[in-house]
A protein has these predicted regions:
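Asparagine-centered polar/low-complexity signal
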Residues: 9, 232-234
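Glycine-rich loop(s) and the adjacent beta-strand/alpha-helix scaffold that form part
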Residues: 1-41, 53
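FAD-dependent oxidoreductase catalytic-site/capping-region signature
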Residues: 22-26, 39-232
């Protein structure tokens, strides 16, 4: 039974992170003698009182905003983190820092998910095709410039140190290249088994999540969303 929409229409929030170092005495998570001591004391506080530093989500604040006044609803999201975040924390750094994520909430780019083999233990081929639509890049450049203006404002002057990956916010070409080099998933994939009417050739399930043309089979996860929502899926 052929359903051409299976594995098509992949959408995800494309995410760009900028980070700055901060002194170790700040309320941030980091790899330093002082930071290790802070965590050790915080663990005891948590065990005794269920309070303190380790109750933090680390992603401590967020914001939704519009890239232009004429945009009807927010199209960019910021998430602030009290730690250095580099390549989803796969790249570790000594010291302390703060980071800010910016996401395109309603991306135009569409990717695919395919299979390599009939063996279910073989990993699938996932191609998000991030930034394949230039509108996403242009919007993320605006978001990157906004996040940089916020973190480089006077409110952070007393704690902000060096930028982990320096880029001039006013240099649009440099910001675009930095985004191409480092932007990645925010882990909100949807769309590869989209819900839709029979008239939609890429629809995989109906309004009751039943797979079209196959009796007794339903899909009940975020892959049935036809489009990505303007916020976290989890």
């Amino acid at each position: 039974h052929a359903l051409p929409g299976v594995g098509q229409n992949l959408q995800d929030h494309i995410d760009y992170v900028q980070s700055w170092t901060v002194p170790s005495h700040t309320a941030s998570f980091g790899a330093s003698p002082r930071g290790i001591g802070q965590i050790a004391r915080a663990m005891f506080e948590w065990r005794r009182q269920r309070s303190g530093m380790v109750t933090s989500t680390i992603a401590t604040a967020g914001a939704f905003f519009r890239s232009a006044p004429e945009v009807a609803v927010p199209d960019l999201q910021l998430v602030f983190v009290v730690a250095l975040v580099d390549d989803h924390a796969r790249k570790a750094h000594l010291g302390h820092g703060i980071s800010c994520h910016v996401d395109v909430l309603r991306p135009y780019s569409r990717g695919t998910v395919g299979i390599r083999s009939s063996n279910p233990r073989v990993a699938p081929v996932i191609d998000p095709q991030f930034l394949s639509d230039e509108r996403d890049l242009a919007l993320l450049v605006q978001g990157g410039q906004m996040q940089q203006r916020i973190l480089e404002s006077a409110a952070f002057d007393s704690v902000r140190g060096k930028m982990l990956y320096p880029v001039k916010s006013g240099d649009t070409a440099a910001m675009a290249q930095a985004i191409r080099n480092r932007a990645d998933t925010q882990y909100h994939p949807v769309g590869t088994c989209k819900m839709g009417p029979d008239s939609d050739p890429l629809a995989v399930v109906d309004a009751q999540l039943r797979v079209k043309g196959i009796a007794g089979l339903r899909v009940a996860d975020a892959s049935i969303m036809p489009t990505l929502i303007g916020g976290n899926t989890n």
